[in-house]
């Protein structure tokens, strides 16, 4: 199903379930105080620049998005404030299909959820705090750079399935991987910043 937005819409809530693919495209935008909720095994692709201020919640399946900005700035996943409850990881895969960017958005990791950076030439720098009890997995062909030693606030494991995970400073490397300090490497590459100017790489 392809939804073409040619104007601004302000629903109370957006809920997408099922096993198919729903793609939201066009020059319009999702605005207002709406929340976007994704369940079911299918895919929801958000390809519009949205300004809704409610939370984005993924329970199951794939939520595909092509832009990511700081909190309160419009993006494919809205313009919610920089609070953990505004971006919920409760299962499934967040699939980022855009280019290099950075964000200070915080998130709540409730259960194992994957963040996939699709493009090999894309780097996403995370400057927010992720908290919660769930596991967080990284995958794809691109790179996630951790820009703050407060990012790993969640209690679950960090799982690297693909792509690159870059701990960009010595302080971040020393802070550990999640409050459980449990790292599971299934694939991909881990880069850590040492006391010298270089990086240690593990794969």
Model segments located where?
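Beta-strand repeat architectures
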Residues: 1-45, 53-124, 129-145, 153-203
């Amino acid at each position: 199903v392809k939804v073409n937005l040619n104007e601004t819409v302000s629903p109370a809530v957006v809920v997408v379930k099922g096993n198919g693919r729903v793609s939201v495209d066009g020059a319009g935008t999702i605005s207002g105080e709406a929340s976007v909720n994704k369940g079911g095994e299918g895919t929801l692709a958000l390809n519009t620049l949205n300004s809704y201020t409610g939370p984005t919640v993924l329970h199951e399946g794939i939520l595909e998005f092509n832009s990511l900005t700081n909190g309160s700035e419009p993006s494919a996943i809205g313009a919610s404030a920089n609070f953990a409850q505004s971006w919920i990881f409760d299962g499934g895969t967040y699939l980022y299909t855009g280019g290099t960017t950075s964000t200070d958005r915080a998130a709540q990791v409730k259960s194992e959820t994957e963040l996939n950076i699709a493009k090999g030439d894309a780097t996403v720098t995370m400057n927010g705090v992720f908290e919660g009890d769930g596991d967080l997995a990284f995958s794809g062909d691109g790179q996630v750079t951790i820009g703050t030693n407060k990012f790993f606030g969640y209690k679950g494991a960090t799982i690297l399935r693909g792509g690159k995970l870059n701990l960009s400073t010595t302080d971040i490397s020393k802070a550990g991987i999640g409050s459980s300090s449990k790292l599971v490497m299934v694939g991909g590459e881990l880069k850590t910043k040492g006391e010298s100017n270089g990086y240690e790489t593990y794969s």
